[in-house]
Amino acid sequence: MNKLSAVLVCLTLGFFSCNNAVKNSKKLDLAKSFFTALDHSNSNEATELISDKFKTIDDGFEQEYNGFEFAEWVKWDSVFQPSYQILKLEEEKGIVTATISKTDKRITFLHQDPIITEEFIQFEGNKIRSIERNSVSFNVERFVTSRDELVNWIEEHHPEINGFLNDQTKNGGMNYLRAIDLYRNKDN
């Protein structure tokens, strides 16, 4: 009877360990799929992976989205031709931690280098509920100085596209990109 009990205990532990590994693997797969969707600027796939009330926290700044709003943000992001690279991805206690490198035309202009963030991804069932990002490599002074120079120059020379900075729609992104191009070619 002792041997039978020991075998049953081992089988039970093995079952629950495998079941936990499968759940953890699903969360890692969801996170990978999410960053792949962002990398491909696939707003439909990205919104399928988030909960109805999705929240991002970027260095303390909170933003809540519904599916439509997040799809619009992905379309805005797509204008700059982003590249999301997963540098590290792991799961512990139900939270996925990712180190992400992002670059695009906007970041290249404002920051010159990729922005690297550590991201803490929380889930609600099989959906991503929130992502908290903390900058690992981000030169705030360079970014803000470049952004302010761009905004001030556009206000003076092309006021028709002023407001591009806060318009996170595809049209707003196109105006942002146009502002960058106009600024870069200002001496021509």
Identify the residue ranges that each predicted region occupies:
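Short, solvent-exposed secondary-structure junction/capping segments
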Residues: K32-T36, E48-E62
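Solenoid-repeat scaffolds in large eukaryotic assemblies
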Residues: S43-T47
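Bacterial Sec-dependent N-terminal signal peptides
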Residues: M1-K26
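Short beta-edge strand/loop motif at the mouth of beta-sheet-based domains
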Residues: E62-V74
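Short, low-complexity N-terminal intrinsically disordered segments enriched in polar/charged residues
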Residues: C18-H40
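Low-complexity, intrinsically disordered terminal/linker segments enriched in charged
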Residues: I131-N188
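Surface-exposed, charged secondary-structure patches
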Residues: A71-I116
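Short, solvent-exposed coil/turn segments at beta-strand boundaries
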Residues: E92-I95, I121-R129
